[in-house]
């Protein structure tokens, strides 16, 4: 039996852009040929694609690092370097992707073939042909390729099911799924026979169909991690209707109504929104002695919790083993699904603003200035660091261009205001230089 894995932590790194080239045209009969260095190729992006054939995140158990290839360097004759191919990572339907550092949801992948760029490849550096001007017709300037984005991610699989079966262990959830669908869950006369979610397609006599999930049994304290805990509670979140299965024969010695209250408390504690989903109470094992008396007592206790303004949940008496009452239950479930919309899984505040992430923020902070214990001034900031890594420090003209960019950003003036003096050391990353006032 293959293992069921529904969470994973991975890292992804997009490819770096290829470096631009410094080259000059040198051909017979072409005097003053000018610059001829081409741009570097784009780095490969990391793209997640949904594959309906996958059922778990098992592929990520041992393969946790995904790195796309870098673009090729620019070439002479103004030719661009070859762009790297994107790295396609296949994930199962129902995979939620979060930023591990912020906890924000990046994307929710539910449709077969759906694709999302998770880490964007760096752009290629410009070759010297791009920097030619009337004042400098033969520039010895080329950019390094831009680094690709790097992210730490948390993947979470929540199976796609219209209906979820919940209840204590051994109340008959797996048996119910096995008789109303072609699913073959493991069934046994002991607790936690079901240790992974099972999914089956149900078709009613009237022709309606829906996906039903049998989830591992819950016990008191599950929302705090007791038993199988929250490990599988997450799979209920995508369901639109909950079938709350109760052993009305009380064969385990528990009170059916207390079971009902206890499970609902766990659902509410785990995620308050789960209680927004309509529930149908499935009174199972009604072919057993005392089940009828227990059902009467159950209904009496349940009625005390509702008033004239709140409708009692629907209750269906069934016996999965004897195949009794199943048709009415399934028809009612299909009718309830037809008038129940999808539920929002996340608040907007939980979602990453991808436009802002990919550089369309209204105000990007250009740089910050701090001072180390050794009195070195330290420059940081996304824009400044991006300019720095794309500067070819082996060429004087590139360094001079970077110095002009710093002045244009106001770095020199800001250093003076902070008290920097001629000859002070300034550091960007691992690169150090002297401040010249």
From Swiss-Prot:
GTP binds at residues 167-174, 192-196, 214-217, 284-287, 319-321. The keyword NADP does not apply. Keywords: Cytoplasm, GTP-binding, Hydrolase, Magnesium, Metal-binding, Nucleotide-binding. This is GTPase Obg. Residues 2-160 form the Obg domain. Mg(2+) binds at residues 174, 194. Residues 161-338 form the OBG-type G domain. Transmembrane segments: none annotated.
